[in-house]
Structures are given as structure tokens and as C-alpha cells.
Amino acid sequence: MAEPDIKSFERRMDGAVETLRKEFGGLRTGRASTTLLDPVYVDAYGSSSPLNQVATVGVPEPRLITVQVWDRSLVKAVEKAIREAGLGLNPQSDGQTLRVPIPELNQERRQELAKVAAKYAEQARVAVRNVRRDGMDMLKKLLKDGDISEDEQKTWADKVQALTDAHIKKIDEALATKEKEIMQV
């Protein structure tokens, strides 16, 4: 009797949840976070580089991010990249260090960010459901090929469904936490 590889489905579902957490990290709330600048790429040395490859990013205060640029010649490029990243941030140069104050979010922007968070969560739910569908298809194939009995197929299908439910619950909890964080004034 063949045994379905449920662990691979669990890893794929975990990956969807982890991707969601990373996307949530990039959403700006009223608080400073180093992950806020993850989507920033700097034109440096003839190519586009992630900010963390040309500078050290820190959070000395809850509403301030500091960017310590390693190469003085890149300070202007880093400042421009942060300003043009569409994050609504305005860095101020202080020698080789950039200070990036995190402005208060207005209610309209908070609601907009909550919608974006909900969209990310829905994408993660779809990814988890796709993994579930793949698992169910594999179980049907194993049943059709005679590798497992109908009872075994039902048992494994219940396990795949339980995994799906657990991961959807994690996604919903992460969304609720992020929405609360975004809406907090």
C-alpha cells in the first residue's frame, strides 16, 4: 500500500502562511520596522540591489528607521530609492546615515492598508486551497490505481482537510492581528 506524502502538502501550506507573514511585514503600520524597507531597491554599482545589501537598517525608536549607508557615494541613491518606493516615506540625510521618520497614518490610508492585508490573506487562502486540491487529486489517483482502499482514501482526505483548516485558521489569525495593528491609532 502506498502512503501519501502529507508532509509535502504541509510544507507547501506552511510556505503560503510564511509568505503571507513576509507580505504583512512590508505593510506600513504606525510603527517602524526594518521589514518596511524590504521592497526598496537601490541603483548601485550599475545594478539594482536590495537596500540591505548596501546599508544597515535599524529601528532606534518606535517611529524612526535609521539607514546606515556603507558607501558614502550611495547616500543620494539610497535616499532617492526610499523616497520613490511608494511607501510614503521621506528620508532625511545626516551624513552617511539616513533618518526615516514614520508619519502617522490617516484613517483613509489605514482602511486602504487593511484592504491590501485582506487581499494578501485571500491570496494565501487560495494557495492553501490549491495545495488541498492537489492532495485530494493525488488521493483520487491512488484510489483509482488501487494503491489505497476507499476507507484509507477517506482517512487521508480527512487529514488533508484538517491541515487545510488549520492553515486557513492561521491565515485568519494573522490577518486579524495585522488589521488590529493597522487600525490602532
Curated annotation (Swiss-Prot):
Gene expressing this chain: frr
- Native organism is Rhodospirillum centenum (strain ATCC 51521 / SW)
Q: Does the keyword Flavoprotein apply?
A: no
Q: Which family does it belong to?
A: Belongs to the RRF family.
Q: Which compartments is it annotated to reside in?
A: Cytoplasm
**Per UniProt, which keywords does this protein have?**
Cytoplasm, Protein biosynthesis
Q: What is this protein called?
A: Ribosome-recycling factor
Any one GO molecular function term: ribosomal large subunit binding
* Any single biological process term in GO: cytoplasmic translational termination
